[in-house]
């Protein structure tokens, strides 16, 4: 799913890697940004772990910008992991950018569960406008996986 933040629309680019019609793309847990290796845009993100949604009204002056790299999508890499593999959970649980994966442990939501981390992203879109964005869920109301939901709003 490709999203145009400016027009708040889902778009269907014929060739996403070379088009400027989208800002972010979602596929299961992978989120791409139209910048770096994922697209020709100048989109980038800054992460604020534990940031407050209502207090995030402008771009931080100390923002560190990240784009997608060959082996690291920005949304899945930033912020860096605080929780990493626990042997009791098969060593595969932990933080992965925007989400926490429970692996073989039941952290209250069940095994193999994906939960959004408490992260506010500041996103620079392909046209240079700025947005705040946060992931809300990975599951739909029926509990089916791979239905990520998020909210976003323009910044000053």
Regions found by a protein language model. Give the residues of each.
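Surface-exposed, beta-sheet-biased, low-hydrophobicity segments with strongly acidic/polar composition
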Residues: 1-156
């Amino acid at each position: 799913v490709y999203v145009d933040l400016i027009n708040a629309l889902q778009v269907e680019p014929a060739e996403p890697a070379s088009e400027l019609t989208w800002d972010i793309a979602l596929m299961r847990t992978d989120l791409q940004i139209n910048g770096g290796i994922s697209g020709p845009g100048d989109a980038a993100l800054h992460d604020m772990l534990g940031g407050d949604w209502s207090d995030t009204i402008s771009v931080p002056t100390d923002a560190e910008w990240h784009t997608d790299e060959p082996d690291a999508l920005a949304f899945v890499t930033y912020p860096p992991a605080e929780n990493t593999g626990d042997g009791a959970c098969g060593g595969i649980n932990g933080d992965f950018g925007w989400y926490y994966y429970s692996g073989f442990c039941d952290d209250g939501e069940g095994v193999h569960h994906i939960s959004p981390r408490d992260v506010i992203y500041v996103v620079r879109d392909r046209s240079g406008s700025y947005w705040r964005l946060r992931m809300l869920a990975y599951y739909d109301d029926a509990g089916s996986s791979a239905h990520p939901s998020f909210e976003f709003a323009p910044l000053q």
